[in-house]
Amino acid sequence: MPVAGIAPSPEQHPGTADLVVRNAKVFTGDPGRPAAGAVAVRDGRILALGDDHDLAGLVGPATRVVDALGRRVVPGLNDSHLHVIRGGLNYVLELRWDGVRSLRRALAMLREQAGRTPKGQWIRVGGGWTPEQFAERRMPTVAELNAAAPDTPVFVLHLYQSALMNRAAVRAAGFTRDTPDPRGGQIVRGRDGEPTGVLLAAPGALVLYSTLARAPRLDEADRRTSTVHFLRELNRFGLTSALDAAGGFQNFPEDYATVVDLARTGELSLRISYYLFPQTAGQELADLRRWTQTVRPGDGDEWLRLAGAGENLTWAAADFENFAEPRPDLADDYEAEFEQAVRLLMENGWGFRLHATYDETIRRDLAVFEKLAAEGLFPAGNRWLFDHAETVRDDSLDRIAALGGSLSVQNRMSFQGGVFLDRYGAAAASRTPPVRAMLDRGLTVAAGTDATRVSSYNPWVALHWLVTGRTVGGTALRPPVELLDRQEALGLYTRGGARLTGEEDVKGVLREGCYADLAVLSQDYLTVPEEVIPDIESVLTVVGGRIVHAAAEYAGLEEAAPPVSPAWSPVAHFGGYARSDGAGQADAVAEFVAESERHRAWRAARSGAGPAPGPAYPVDPCLSH
């Protein structure tokens, strides 16, 4: 294990380091000192940067010295829009298809999990995947879910667009021919009037979330363990901070209690800045008023801190982003209630973040802000930002800049780019969202994923999109003029997020006195071929000087975590994001493609459109192994 290599100096420095990472290619993110060969850490902060010789005097008898073996070291990543609290509470319940390269494999995982899931529990595939990632390039069918898990309820969420349920899940959810469609959603029915197992966001996603909420929840002990393991999974990719954007079915303070307790006991392995999101239409102003009277932005510490309100302030002002459906028309009069909410926050010193997908929504929101600006309420020193902003226009960006706003962009187009392209065309997709135009105006821009329900939480997939403009299926959406170079993109994932929370002096760069948050990468992000970027992981992640993730040569150096619980959890058996084995991956994809050809033959034979599949394949080959 490479944990030595600098001999202690004969005369110990009066302040020796707790940790030294040597023999590294350190990208600091600091324009004043962009590179180094070693980094020293003490008391959770960066003590010094230099080369191995420079830092030799900081090595004492108790110093842990890690040889990076020439690997790239970067500042810890910061996802500026991640539903980390909700994700943590559900992580061990979910079967993750993130990174799985074939539908055949995904369905095999489903069938295997059905064999261990106890009666009464559901199998949940909770987003983070797209058919474009599969060799077969298609969705699963309800029939395939029924075949894989005939008796165990299965709920498969596909982005914010749709969900598939097997027969057992339809029964468990209580859906019948008499169940009414929820507002903004559709329960698809067959000719007999019975639910088929397909749910559509048309365009609102409430039908998807409310159905998923019918599944059993974890008890508090398992919610705690689940959160610990989700944070460690994020650490696996070099994430050291995140801005939690709240979300539906995430109630304050009840659903925040787990992370509050982990912060109290010093067990968080990720720094979290969190927002508060009114949950019930018609009660938004009452919720916001109560919060402004009981808590304040800044409450907490460097590990867990309240940042403000959002990403929704009022439900009527939210435009949903199912690009398979037309842009939703918001109510003609939503501004009246929305103005009251924003006024309340600004008058009480609260910042906020605001979900806004379409420029049409952004322009209406900006008109409200400009009205309040005339009264001196903007910018007023309160941090505020738009989330998503896929179709924001240049003149709207100018208005955002004038009002002191910022933006958080995500790689939803990595997963939804195909349907966006189909609806709006190549010209619109080429600058969705217009990140280059944002940066050219000097706006603060931060990057994130919007995981776990749409994109995967893997930040390297998001970075790949920023530098290539390609979907996970390889479709090129953005021309070279709209792309970022690798250092620019990394800056959005480090310094950008720190600026949104006012922590740019201590976070997002490797500089003396800053938080000791860093990642030693499996491959050099700055030099590897573009197609390799999504496969990057961290082999050593340090947060506040603590080693919270260690792999490869460093396995065993990380802080201990409790076993995954419950024992039947999909995470206990499959882990989270599917691992890539590099060269072995090509062989696996070839196998998947071969299997998909067999699958197509089987489907054709079943429909009468092709030759019989033969006696060896009386059932779907996806489910026969």
Predicted regions located by residue number:
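N-terminal export leaders
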Residues: 1-2
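Divalent metal-binding segments
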Residues: 5-23, 27, 31-290, 303-361, ...
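In a subset of proteins, long, contiguous C-terminal domains/tails are tracked
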Residues: 17, 24, 48, 348, ...
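Flexible loop residues that form catalytic
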Residues: 29, 128, 247, 389-390, ...
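Residue-level recognition of conserved beta-strand edge/terminus positions
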Residues: 126, 157, 410, 519-522, ...
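Accessory "access/gating" subregions that flank catalytic or transport cores
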Residues: 297-300
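His/Asp/Glu-enriched, well-ordered alpha-helical/loop segment
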Residues: 343-353, 357-384, 388-389, 394-398, ...
